[in-house]
Amino acid sequence: MPFMHGSMPLRRTFFYLQQGKVKLRDNVNVFSMGFHKNPTPEQSGARDFVYWNWAQLQYHNPKVQLVKHADKVVTPFARAYLNDGREVLFDLDGMKREEIEKLLAKTLGKTELVERREHLESIAKLNPADFGSKNERQCMCEVQGQHPCTGLLRAPQCVTGKYRWNHNLI
């Protein structure tokens, strides 16, 4: 397989995808980037950013549409379309991959406070499979298709735990 040579498999690992630093805000709908596949040395930062960071952008921003414009532009650029109809345009000519990453994280990215809050909310989110007084469902019998409570209906003798079919075991 041609994509499994060189640095290609590294970019597909789960650990590498989690290392992405650009987590776009919720008001970003579309993010597009124009670059050259065979750039001049001043324009190579945009191509390198797409090569190394595009998969991380897709992983961390599943609700954002990401568009690449390869070899269709004169100078490399990035453009973000926001919810309210505004556009944010970045000129990436002469910037390196790390500079582009910092620029996008600072202007379009979530702040550390927002990221920390979302992380704590995801931890505290109640699991719908949990049962008990602090959860949505009090008992397993409230789920459709499950056995009713033994308080409402007598359980079969083989389910109660008091029934032993082989008395010679003990």
Curated annotation (Swiss-Prot):
Keyword list, A-Z: Mitochondrion, Ribonucleoprotein, Ribosomal protein
Endpoints of the signal sequence: none
Superkingdom of origin: Eukaryota
Positions of transmembrane segments: none
Subcellular location: Mitochondrion
Single GO molecular function: structural constituent of ribosome
InterPro entries: Ribosomal_mL43/mS25/NADH_DH (IPR007741), Ribosomal_mS25/mL61 (IPR040049), Thioredoxin-like_sf (IPR036249)
SMART domains: L51_S25_CI-B8
GO cellular component: mitochondrial small ribosomal subunit; mitochondrion
Subunit annotation: Component of the mitochondrial ribosome small subunit (28S) which comprises a 12S rRNA and about 30 distinct proteins.
Homology family: Belongs to the mitochondrion-specific ribosomal protein mS25 family.
Protein known as: Small ribosomal subunit protein mS25
The organism of origin for this protein: Caenorhabditis elegans
Top-level taxonomy: Eukaryota, Metazoa, Ecdysozoa, Nematoda, Chromadorea
